[in-house]
């Protein structure tokens, strides 16, 4: 997650873009995977997920509540100066997302957002499935960039799920074995 994530434009995330949007996300992950090989001392990716103000308010609130429940930063390492407030009744959201399990709550989130005629934004979906220990630092409106709603996140590189690591990091090494010569070759993620 970096400002590169903002370069995956809304039209590329659209479900109407079909496989073109999926390739844009794959290219983003492949680039981040390559970065971990070339710069093996990188421990964290810090960045943001962006949602557009045109997104359904209740759908947005469900996503933000879900993210905070399952990835919220309990240590309060970072907080927005002017956090975006959820408009939907929190008790209703609490009753809706009533499971301790990410998987069970995710099924509910996906179903409820689809009932509104929307999908969970692809980048949000992608980040949630990258690491079970992702941290979410809250959301704020970026008034200088079209009033988009930006949610701060942190992902520990060594906690990226194995299937994602294989797909986006190890695949880079197979295609570019010379990249391991840039470092000692003892990559902390690949030798995990």
Residue ranges of model-derived segments:
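Single conserved hydrophobic/aromatic residue that forms the stacking wall/gate
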Residues: 1-9
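Non-catalytic substrate-recognition and accessory regions of acyl/acetyltransferase enzymes
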Residues: 6-7, 149-192
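A short, internal acetyl-CoA/4′-phosphopantetheine-binding micro-motif in the GNAT/acyltransferase core
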Residues: 10-20
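Conserved beta-strand-loop-alpha-helix junction that forms the acyl-donor binding cleft
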Residues: 15, 46-56, 115
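Conserved acetyl-CoA-binding loop-helix of GNAT-fold acetyltransferases
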Residues: 18-35
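Conserved GNAT acetyl-CoA-binding A-motif
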Residues: 36-50
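A conserved mid-domain beta-alpha-beta active-site/ligand-binding segment of alpha/beta enzyme cores
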Residues: 73-124
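C-terminal accessory regions appended to core domains
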Residues: 116-123, 128-142, 148-155
């Amino acid at each position: 997650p970096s400002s590169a994530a903002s370069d995956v434009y809304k039209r590329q995330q659209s479900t109407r873009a079909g496989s073109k949007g999926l390739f844009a996300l794959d290219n983003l992950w492949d680039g981040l995977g390559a970065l971990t090989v070339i710069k093996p001392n990188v421990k964290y990716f810090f960045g943001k997920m962006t949602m557009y103000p045109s997104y359904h308010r209740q759908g947005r609130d469900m996503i933000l509540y879900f993210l905070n429940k399952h990835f919220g930063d309990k240590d309060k390492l970072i907080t927005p100066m002017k956090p975006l407030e959820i408009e939907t009744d929190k008790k209703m959201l609490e009753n809706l997302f009533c499971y301790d399990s990410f998987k069970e709550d995710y099924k509910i989130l996906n179903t409820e957002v689809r009932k509104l005629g929307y999908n969970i934004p692809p980048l949000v979906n992608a980040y949630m499935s990258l690491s079970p220990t992702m941290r979410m630092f809250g959301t704020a409106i970026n008034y200088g960039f079209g009033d988009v709603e930006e949610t701060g996140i942190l992902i520990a590189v060594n906690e990226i799920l194995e299937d994602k690591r294989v797909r986006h990091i190890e695949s880079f090494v197979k295609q570019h074995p010379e990249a391991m010569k840039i470092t000692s070759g003892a990559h902390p993620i690949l030798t995990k």
